[in-house]
A protein has these predicted regions:
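Conserved short strand/loop->alpha-helix "switch" segment adjacent to the catalytic nucleotide/phosphoryl-transfer site
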Residues: 1, 80-110, 128-131
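Conserved DHp (HisKA) dimerization/phosphotransfer helix of two-component histidine kinases, i.e.
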Residues: 5-88
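Conserved ATP-binding N-box helix of the HATPase_c
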Residues: 12-19, 23, 95-123
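Short, exposed beta-strand/loop patches in secreted or surface proteins that constitute
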Residues: 75, 123-124, 152-156
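Short, non-transmembrane amphipathic alpha-helical segments
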Residues: 105-111, 142-153
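Short beta-strand/loop element within the Bergerat-fold HATPase_c
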Residues: 121-131, 135
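Glycine-rich acidic phosphate-binding loop
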Residues: 134-142, 169-171
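Flexible, glycine-/charge-rich segments associated with ATP-binding catalytic modules
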Residues: 146-180
Length: 180
């Protein structure tokens, strides 16, 4: 399990090492604060690893567990200085793949926008489908995420807000009772 988690979080671990090295070198208080704000990456590593542990132990991940991951990450984004709100509707169980895909998409958006992120709204609805919608105010274009998430939909409005959506089919074996 440890090797699997290390492999899957290798990019974020490398980013964290680079940030810590830069933090040790900087003498600028504003830059140090900015670097410290990037504990978002550390939270992602911790929470994603936890999703894998829970998923392996229980065979599925509850929507509540995913909610806890996103809420903690959202709190860190607020500390970082951006507005952030997470809304998750629905209950039941998700596969490990579904839960990590949701969390990975969230993290990919945050990592892409980290330097310019002003606001992020995350909305997830779990029913027959797992529907993910993110509204992002930041300077970096997110359309490039489609290479990593092929079924991703992206658009940008005239005010520069970006909308990222993805729809995942729920696996029958982990649907909550009464949702079949």
């Amino acid at each position: 399990l440890y090797d699997m988690m290390e492999t899957q979080a290798a990019r974020q671990i490398a980013m964290l090492r680079d940030l810590l090295a830069e933090l040790q070198k900087t003498e600028e208080p504003d830059r140090a604060r900015h670097l410290l704000g990037q504990v978002i990456i550390g939270t992602y590593i911790k929470r994603r690893s936890n999703l894998i542990f829970v998923g392996v132990q229980r065979g599925a991940i509850s929507v509540q567990e995913l909610r806890l991951c996103l809420n903690e990450s959202s709190e860190n984004i607020i500390v970082y200085g951006a507005d952030c709100k997470t809304t998750i509707k629905g209950e039941g169980q998700l596969t490990v793949e579904q839960a990590t895909q949701v969390y990975d998409l969230f993290e990919a958006v945050v990592e892409t926008e980290l330097e310019s992120l002003r606001a992020l709204l995350i909305s997830i609805e779990v029913g027959k489908w797992v529907e993910i919608a993110l509204c992002v105010s930041g300077a970096e274009p997110l359309c490039g995420l489609r290479t990593r998430f092929p079924d991703l939909e992206w658009e940008q409005d005239e005010d520069g807000l970006q909308y990222v959506t993805q729809k995942l089919e729920r696996t029958r074996s982990v649907k909550a009772h009464g949702q079949d």
